[in-house]
């Protein structure tokens, strides 16, 4: 018997020996796989890369070794990989080191298959249960190796290393697996009869299980006085019973349920049919097929989700989501606002743990027609100096699905490093217009507005219905001399091009006036826009009124004029991109941002997170999860 001594450093610094076992004829050969990469499992958590290199280095020339670790804690995951220069050395390592203790713990060595389909196919994989506790990986391998080349072999163990009584063996081909099943199923291993059969995933086991053929019966709603003998007497007349037990707690009291196992499945089925609903000691029994815990949990979860969905579908069109509420509005006040449009079954203002209003709430009507009428009449209406946002309430999951569907075709926006002057992109007429450079329609990556996700033209009373074409985007070029070293602009001194956009000259404002922000603004984000005609601050209400008389393109431009300077105060470098993202929100939401510095800062921060994620890759996923409304 060949003995190979592998000397290496133990985790505590002492020297440990790894003693090899004789090579088995059932080991997989290198010529079969032509593989130089090995998987090493069941490693001690203290084994390092260098110690793994020392153990396998005696088998041949090792190219690389790696112990896999948790990304956060850097703790070993208990497995690693070893790469040799030639297949012969890898085959020798499998034959001589498989199941050999490495620093006190037997390791498993097998070929590494990078193609996951090979590992997950289940071909040649068998399941063994009712194993004696003394049978370990090596004993199981030695037992099954005579039927063919074994790819992997494992006995399931708990956290303390004790066998759970079952294991798995995967052969290189299906023929070897079938041969092992035929020869060993029902045989005695260490005086215990074992079951050997094809491996089935849990989903496959559940789907292939014949729920009409069962022998184990579940009984509940038992009286406290019901005993095991009572169950035997009640069920015994339907067939031969192998066991009957009433489940008890630690104090010996009945838990109110039990199990009866029949020898014949037909007898069990007749007992269920006859005794389900039977009264015993004034208790009506429930009798049915005994289920596994996982099966029962799955069934209950499916039933719960179905009931939840049915309830949501029933009230979906009757439940309204209300946003941009004044902090002074209570549940009663919210109900009073919506009551003129129908029967309000419930109204709720959402609050934080301190009782402060979150500015949003829900109103449920008796019928969908009443909810639709309330939404059409109150969307954009000024309540306590704030325009309401009213829409059909959506579940979070449904909203995410809609966002994913909307942005599934959006291509990532590449964030290039800034060179020279900043060139923001937003609709014509934006602040700081220099020489206008038109580039036609916005590219797909600009996230064009779509019905139901962009601005809603009827959120402000009198706003024109229908959506026009996507507005053209342009890049206003800010002159270098107007740029501060820190990326900001000097107050004033911005030269407009001699030829303005005709729409800008004639239709920008109903009274022919432009908006501007006061010079020398500070860090606050709630400075109201100015009407240049009167040099007086333009209130949100007046802005909403002006928006109601403008076309969709003009509305977007007007809001961009007002929003851009506020965004620039919070995020100067990406102000244009962030402004464009915020303008995709509903009109009332943008108006809310204009008067709420805290809300604006939160949305800007959210937009910047998305832009950074897009720059790092995974744009579609980030855009799909973006929720700026």
From Swiss-Prot:
Organism: Arabidopsis thaliana (Mouse-ear cress)
Span list, region Disordered: 1-25, 480-507
Family indicated by similarity: Belongs to the polyadenylate-binding protein type-1 family.
Induction of its expression: By potyvirus TuMV infection.
InterPro entries in the record: Hud_Sxl_RNA (IPR002343), Nucleotide-bd_a/b_plait_sf (IPR012677), PABP-dom (IPR036053), PABP_1234 (IPR006515), PABP_HYD_C (IPR002004), PABP_RRM1 (IPR034364), RBD_domain_sf (IPR035979), RRM2_I_PABPs (IPR045305)
Keyword Cytoplasm among record annotations: yes
Entry-linked Gene3D superfamilies: 3.30.70.330, c-terminal domain of poly(a) binding protein
Keyword terms of this UniProt record: Cytoplasm, Host-virus interaction, Nonsense-mediated mRNA decay, Nucleus, Repeat, RNA-binding, Translation regulation
PANTHER family: RNA BINDING PROTEIN
Tissue expression summary: Expressed in all organs (at the protein level) but under distinct spatial and temporal regulation within each organ.
Biased composition (Polar residues): 1-12
Pfam families referenced in this protein's UniProt entry, alphabetically: MLLE (PF00658), RRM_1 (PF00076)
Gene Ontology molecular function: mRNA binding; translation initiation factor activity
Entry's Gene Ontology cellular component terms: cytoplasm; nucleus; plasma membrane; ribonucleoprotein complex
Domain RRM as annotated: residue spans: 36-114, 124-201, 215-292, 318-395
Skewed-composition ranges (Low complexity): 13-25, 492-507
Cellular compartments annotated: Cytoplasm; Nucleus
Top-level taxon in the UniProt lineage: Eukaryota
Keyword tRNA processing found: no
Database matches in SUPFAM superfamilies: PABC (PABP) domain, RNA-binding domain, RBD
Other information: A.thaliana contains 8 PABP genes.
Descriptive protein name: Polyadenylate-binding protein 2
Main location group: cytoplasm
BP GO annotations: nuclear-transcribed mRNA catabolic process, nonsense-mediated decay; regulation of nuclear-transcribed mRNA catabolic process, deadenylation-dependent decay; regulation of nuclear-transcribed mRNA poly(A) tail shortening; regulation of translational initiation; translational initiation
Mutant lacking the gene: phenotype: Pab2 and pab4 double mutants, as well as pab2 and pab8 double mutants show significant growth and development defects and more resistance to Turnip mosaic virus (TuMV).
